[in-house]
């Protein structure tokens, strides 16, 4: 073990002394291999002459340009040296043309060199084709206006390079084609039309350029998305959910009032509900029959549960009492004629039959009858009878 540790210590001391020498060797190797790698990359570029008929070892302009873009990242040298290497790949008319262009532009860089090559030898569209493509560029179905403007800008620049449209009219032409080919909101369309009209009357009024137009459209799109995301339906409860839960309390809790004959549950409506009070009457014992009670209750059965809906407008106005000083509701015979009560029998939500509740139901489930009863009740609740006009005294 001691001998092994001694050997490890000796190797570390030797490596520490060797590290500076290794770094210097790698740097020298990189400096020597850099030009070699560049020469190898240059040899991968075929020559280009610009002639219609290709000679031996020559490439078309598109292939030559593709090879140049592949080897440029492997050239760690100055712009001037890169242009010299590119010139060595040219032959014939192409070399002569770029030599004259370089003489007129001594500070030429690689990007300008390649741009000049594209203008001289690249395939260019005719002016009629470029103009037709620009005018026929319309917004696709489901495409956002901001993406359409970006696609339109490409065709606009092609038309400008073809000489169809002047650069000074780019903003006006872009804005006009946007109004023709895009589906915009009413507010944004009105705003852009106003800018065009102001520019037509006064050319000193500046029109938005490409970036400003993109910003305006993106702001409108963000506002529309926020509005649609925050918009919620007023009532999202479905009919089947209402069937499963006939009464949903959204406001205050119901008030239970006990009496000798029945339990009366009065439901306070919230502001979103209708202007009618819903009262559920559950009889405990059959009330004693009397002529007055029979005339008031009509043909309704005394053994069944009833749903009574009274509109607050139907209640009589409270009149102050002269004896006690507290207001109470008039219950005279004349007031009964003005009170309108709509009675709807409550049916069992399990079998759909009348006269009993779900807790005491012994019948089999009949969802079809329950759903039919629900539709009828909803139709009756929706089409309330209109109040008759009051007769002037």
UniProtKB/Swiss-Prot annotation:
Family annotation (InterPro entries): PNMA, PNMA_C
Keyword Zinc recorded: yes
Short name of one Pfam family: PNMA
Transmembrane segment boundaries: none
Protein name, per record: Zinc finger CCHC domain-containing protein 18
Keyword Zinc included in the entry's annotation: yes
Keywords annotated in UniProt: Metal-binding, Zinc, Zinc-finger
Region (Disordered): 281-300, 313-341
Family: Belongs to the ZCCHC12 family.
